[in-house]
Swiss-Prot record:
Keyword Zinc: yes
Name used for this protein in its record: Hydrogenase maturation factor HypA
Protein's organism: Azoarcus sp. (strain BH72)
Transmembrane spans: none
Organism phylogeny: Bacteria, Pseudomonadati, Pseudomonadota, Betaproteobacteria, Rhodocyclales
Highest taxon of the lineage: Bacteria
Protein task: Involved in the maturation of [NiFe] hydrogenases. Required for nickel insertion into the metal center of the hydrogenase.
PROSITE patterns according to UniProt: HYPA
Sequence positions that bind Zn(2+): C73, C76, C89, C92
Keyword terms: Metal-binding, Nickel, Zinc
Binding site for Ni(2+): H2
Span of the signal peptide: none
Length: 114
């Protein structure tokens, strides 16, 4: 389960930002996760519950915002919505769709406390 290593990476980012800003507590963590990022959101939530314990973010609210998947269809030369990496283009039915959005995962916002 790679979600555990993702959660550990998030903890590292959160701790670094808190330290850089002199914060002793993080009240809220907002993540953006693309629908095409190959992340099981519920598994990540579970892992975050585990790795954030005894850290500056222990007890912090974790909000996850989904970023819809999109891709560039080479056949009809347009950006189209896609739910999975290998979906057909919803306009022309072609399979030459290059993902352009929804592949990202990032820490979008942190609410720091004293």
């Amino acid at each position: 389960m790679h979600e555990m290593s993702l959660a550990e990476g998030i903890r590292g980012i959160v701790e670094d930002v808190a330290r850089e800003n002199g914060a002793t507590r993080v009240a809220r963590v907002v993540l953006e996760i693309g629908e095409l990022a190959s992340v099981e959101v519920e598994a990540l939530r579970f892992c975050l519950d585990v790795v954030l314990k005894d850290s500056v973010a222990d007890g912090a609210a974790v909000d996850i915002e989904a970023v819809p998947g999109s891709g560039w269809c080479m056949q009809c030369a347009t950006v189209v919505p896609i739910a999975q990496r290998y979906d057909a283009c919803p306009q022309c039915g072609g399979y030459q769709v290059q993902p352009t959005g929804g592949t990202e995962m990032r820490v979008k916002e942190l609410a720091l406390g004293d």
